[in-house]
Swiss-Prot record:
Its main location: membrane. This is Junctophilin-3. The chain crosses the membrane at residues 728-748. MORN repeats lie at residues 15-37, 39-60, 61-82, 83-105, 107-129, 130-152, 288-310, 311-333. It is found in: Cell membrane; Endoplasmic reticulum membrane.
Length: 748
């Protein structure tokens, strides 16, 4: 004996209807958590049998169930997409039809695990079709792609995809995914026609015409481009030139052909190799019959246009790649080896006969394989047509099942109201989030000429992007919060234009003097060098004070241990204002030796590693006058000193610009004197002398070559040696040209 009533779940959902032995039985309504999501229909001992399930997004399923999953036959509405057909344990299949209500794009055939698999027919928004084999939601195996007339073909404007291939996937709630990132025609233009991939010219000619007057490659590259030119120039056909019949097998692009492509930049030529064929008749159609791999024309196949243009041979990623033969409308042929639509080997003069015969044999084998593949593809297309008709029959049965499910849902609502009159139903018996009106199916491509801009055919499920079609259990789907996005690292604090410096003193244990240096910072801030912290025992790290103060330099962050960590280099590259100039001075004084001096030397080398440094030499102040030599930069140097190796400034090599230009050497001025007066102390009985390091920091310049300092007499030798460099360059270029010509004529 069955009874019924209302049961409220802890998560906010409820069931109202009949039950038996503590399980839902008969007709009833079950809502999900917080009243979102609903199943209305018939039940059998706790499981759904026939009814309507509505997701919180508004997507619906109307049909049969088994063991809590969609199983049998039914109709799913997901956005503008509607699937009608069979279901197996929650997945689409085995036979079914999926179509877009907006533009008529659809797939009819076999399914497996929710993806197109087996044989089927895909119809695109412009009316073009594909019949053949499918694997994992992609065209793979053998098939036939038939386009509509060129004037009616969909215009694809998306820069990401350049043909209407198989229909792509979408989210579970019916919202559109981004288009497939992999282009169907790699390197083809942003504007093309659906189903048209065969071009009547070689892409190398596009390069030549676009690069006229903008030759930016070397002579060897120019020879390579000329070598790979094809005789199938569209401009040659348009002007009725007969150059493609020449012995060399190369066409001559006329001035009119250059004018056709004169508006296209060189960058576009190299990046996209755009196909421009304005003379294609609006009634021209194109058919490809052959092999497919990963949703693209790959393998052996035959592509033919209704105007007589035909290619038989090997393909790779929708391009002629391998050996093949091209037949033109006037009956002439071009055969050889192609690489990404470019003819790289064919009938040319001065070729060794044995080599030419080998190419001919490979071309013949490729043509035969393409013809065999075309025959198999036609057979597979016939099988796909039979699967399509069977799928349509299942779709009709699904419509009938959907109508029965709606009737069961109506009875379930009446039953629920009888058991619990207070049971409220909102929004057709459901409290859910009404989805926003979708204006697109799945595609951002648009379309046919002669009609306003409209959405192109959305694409069906694809491998790797197909959402889960699993049927929820007794309760509807729950929405899970997405994890927060990773917080980007804070940008380094910009250097203050008004620099503040503090003076720090250490001991030079080698010379027995103090070393003073100016450090950037404010009064009271922690020092940036870690050697001072080691003296304090390392109890206080620089990170705690400096990070809060925001005074860390962009290039380094120091730890209490004295080791440096590289910062983010990108802000330093974008910085436009030059950093302040640091000047470090050193005085020889009588003081005690300490290990702090050696640590300071290491720190100074680390701080100088990211800067280009101009280091002026030591100056010794003697009682008698000295001879001075003036360099080109205007800096004064003493010649009477016997410099020691360590006087070069803590192991940092002096660097000079080879060009000795004004950017590297700033002449001394009144505002910035080259020599500063510093108090000196006597060390025992030694003569008074002054040692000074003047370090000028500037950001590294990428374009300026750096070389060791040279004297004026060495400059004359450099001028004489550099005069022969252009001669050597010219000789090397001429030698390379000769080798290339020999290679082209005798070895290819």
């Amino acid at each position: 004996m069955s009874s019924g009533g209302r049961f409220n779940f802890d998560d906010g959902g409820s069931y109202c209807g009949g039950w038996e032995d503590g399980k839902a039985h008969g007709h009833g309504v079950c809502t999900g958590p917080k009243g979102q999501g609903e199943y209305t229909g018939s039940w059998s001992h706790g499981f759904e049998v026939l009814g309507v399930y509505t997701w919180p997004s508004g997507n619906t399923y109307q049909g049969t169930w088994a063991q809590g999953k969609r199983h049998g036959i039914g109709l799913e509405s997901k956005g503008k997409w509607v699937y009608k057909g069979e279901w197996t344990h929650g997945f689409k299949g085995r036979y079914g039809v999926r179509e877009c209500a907006g533009n008529g794009a659809k797939y009819e055939g076999t399914w497996s695990n929710g993806l197109q698999d087996g044989y089927g027919t895909e119809t695109y928004s412009d009316g073009g079709t594909y019949q053949g084999q499918w694997v994992g939601g992609m065209r793979q195996g053998y098939g036939v792609r038939q386009s509509v007339p060129y004037g009616m073909a969909a215009v694809i404007r998306s820069p990401l995809r350049t043909s209407i291939n198989s229909l792509r996937s979408e989210h579970t709630n019916g919202t559109a995914l981004h288009p497939d990132a992999s282009p169907a025609v790699a390197g083809s233009p942003a504007v093309s026609r659906g189903g048209f991939v065969l071009v009547a010219h070689s892409d190398s000619e596009i390069l030549k015409s676009k690069k006229k007057g903008l030759f930016r490659r070397s002579l060897l590259s120019g020879l390579k481009l000329r070598k790979s030119e094809s005789k199938s120039s569209l401009a040659s056909q348009r002007s009725k030139q007969s150059s493609f019949r020449s012995e060399a097998g190369m066409s001559t692009v006329s001035s009119t052909a250059s004018d056709i492509h004169s508006t296209i930049s060189l960058g576009e030529a190299e990046a996209e190799l755009a196909v421009i064929e304005d003379d294609i008749d609006a009634t021209t159609t194109e058919t490809y019959v052959g092999e497919w791999k990963n949703d693209k024309r790959s393998g052996f196949g035959v592509s033919q246009r209704s105007d007589g243009l035909k290619y038989e041979g090997e393909w790779a990623s929708n391009r002629r790649h391998g050996y093949g033969c091209m037949t033109f409308p006037d009956g002439t042929k071009e055969e050889g080896k192609y690489k990404q639509n470019i003819l790289v080997g064919g009938k040319r003069k001065n070729l060794i006969p044995l080599r030419a015969s080998k190419i001919r044999e490979k071309v013949d084998r490729a043509v035969e394989a393409a013809e065999r593949a075309a025959t198999i593809a036609k057979q597979k297309a016939e099988i796909a047509a039979s699967r399509t008709s069977h799928s349509r029959a299942k779709a009709e049965a699904a419509l009938t099942a959907a109508q029965k499910a709606q009737e069961e849902a109506r009875i379930a609502r009446i039953t629920a109201k009888e058991f619990s009159p207070s049971f409220q139903h909102r929004e057709n018996g459901l409290e859910y989030q009404r989805p926003k009106r979708q204006t697109s199916c799945d595609d951002i491509e648009v379309l046919s000429t002669g009609t306003p801009l409209q959405q192109e055919s959305p694409e069906l499920y694809r491998k790797g992007t197909t959402p889960s079609d699993l049927t929820p259990d007794d309760s509807p789907l729950q929405s899970f919060p997405t994890s927060p996005a990773a917080t980007p690292p804070p940008a380094p604090a910009a250097r203050n234009k008004v620099a503040h410096f503090s003076r720090q003193v250490s001991v030079d244990e080698e010379r027995g003097g103090d070393i003073q240096m100016l450090l950037e910072g404010r009064a009271g801030d922690c020092a940036r060098s870690s050697w001072g912290e080691e003296q304090a025992g390392g109890s206080r790290g620089v990170r705690s004070g400096a990070l809060r103060g925001g005074l860390l330099v962009d290039d380094f962050r120091t730890r209490g241990s004295g080791r440096k960590q590289p910062g983010n280099p990108k802000p330093r590259e974008r910085r436009t204002e030059s950093p302040p100039v640091f000047t470090w001075t050193s005085h020889h004084r009588a003081s005690n030796h300490s290990p702090g001096g050696s640590r300071l030397l290491e720190l100074q080398e680390e701080k100088l590693s990211n800067y280009r440094m101009e280091m002026k030499p030591l100056l010794r102040m003697e009682t008698h006058p000295q001879k001075r030599r003036y360099s080109k930069g205007g800096a004064c140097r003493g010649l009477g000193d016997d410099h020691r190796p360590e006087d070069r400034g803590f192991g940092v090599q002096r660097l000079r610009s080879k060009a000795q230009n004004k950017e590297n050497f700033r002449p001394a001025s009144s505002a910035e004197p080259a020599v500063q007066k510093l108090a000196s102390l006597r060390l025992g009985g030694a003569e008074p002398r002054l040692l000074r390091w003047d370090l000028t920091f500037s950001p590294p310049q990428k374009s300026l070559p750096v070389a060791l300092e040279s004297d004026e007499e060495n400059g004359d030798e450099l001028k004489s040696s550099t005069g022969s460099a252009p001669i050597l360059v010219v000789m090397v270029i001429l030698l390379n040209i000769g080798v290339a010509i020999l290679f082209i004529n005798f070895f290819i």
